[in-house]
Amino acid sequence: MTNSHGEKRCTRYKLQKTVRERGISPVSRAIQEFEEGQMVHIDIDPSVQKGMPNPKFQGSTGKVIGQRGRSYVLEVRSGNAMKEVFSLPQHLKPQKY
């Protein structure tokens, strides 16, 4: 049988919550707002499948450059290239200085 090439391949542990984090995520993560130019961390919430960025961006940091509907457009460095990543606020955390 050939290996799958889906978007969620190789994410067995990456998209897994710890025992204490199980269940529905708090509403405050869904209604948080970010401003343009603000730095945010991508922290994927596996209990919310909609608006999930590609798992290869898990743990990376980017700058908010805009908004499309309810989701945010982020500028993230991937190697030497700058990529645009779309994500719902459930999968983002503000960077603390």
Curated annotation (Swiss-Prot):
One term of GO molecular function: structural constituent of ribosome
Keyword Ribonucleoprotein belongs to the record: yes
Pfam family, one: Ribosomal_L21e
Keywords from the named record: Ribonucleoprotein, Ribosomal protein
Entry's Gene Ontology cellular component terms: cytosolic large ribosomal subunit
Gene Ontology terms describing biological process: translation
PANTHER family: 60S RIBOSOMAL PROTEIN L21
Database matches in HAMAP family: Ribosomal_eL21
Family: Belongs to the eukaryotic ribosomal protein eL21 family.
Protein name from the UniProt record: Large ribosomal subunit protein eL21
Organism: Methanosarcina acetivorans (strain ATCC 35395 / DSM 2834 / JCM 12185 / C2A)
Lineage: Archaea, Methanobacteriati, Methanobacteriota, Stenosarchaea group, Methanomicrobia
